[in-house]
């Protein structure tokens, strides 16, 4: 009986952990050097940019090492267009986005940029 109770508790913890992960949704982690002021996503190769995801943040920007909740995006591969406080506009291509996970963009990925 005790074993059944322990197994039930363990199963409940695993299930609640998975549910909590799903509730977190998709998040972006800014690992670039500068504050991101706009962030838009398009299905990879389509140049069909969605809304500015930075509007999901209280101050409308994403500081270095800050995470941002992404809305209205299904898991898949996306091109990400971002601008930062220096005026740089960059496109990072073919970024994998998974449900309940964080995707990051690092400074070294910003190779397709203009001012």
Describe each PLM feature range.
Residues 16-20:
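Sec/Tat signal peptide C-region and signal peptidase I cleavage site
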Residues 49-74:
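Intrinsically disordered, low-complexity Pro/Gly/Ser/Thr-rich segments with frequent PxxP/GP/PP motifs
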Residues 22-26, 66:
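Structural beta-strand segments of beta-rich domains
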Residues 3-14:
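Sec-dependent N-terminal signal peptides
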Residues 27-34, 43:
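Asparagine-centered strand-capping/turn motif at beta-strand->loop junctions
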Residues 21, 83-114:
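Structured interaction patches on ligand/partner-binding surfaces of diverse proteins
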Residues 78-80:
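A short tyrosine-centered beta-strand micro-motif
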């Amino acid at each position: 009986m005790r074993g059944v109770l322990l197994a039930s508790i363990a199963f409940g913890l695993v299930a609640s952990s998975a549910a909590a992960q799903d509730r977190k949704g998709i998040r972006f982690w800014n690992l670039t050097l500068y504050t991101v002021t706009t962030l838009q996503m398009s299905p990879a190769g389509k140049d069909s940019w969605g809304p500015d995801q930075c509007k999901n943040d209280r101050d409308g920007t994403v500081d270095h090492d800050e995470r941002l909740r992404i809305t209205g995006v299904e898991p898949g591969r996306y091109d990400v267009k971002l601008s930062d406080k220096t005026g740089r506009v960059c496109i990072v291509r073919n970024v994998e986005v998974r449900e309940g996970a964080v995707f990051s963009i690092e400074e070294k990925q910003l190779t397709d940029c203009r001012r």
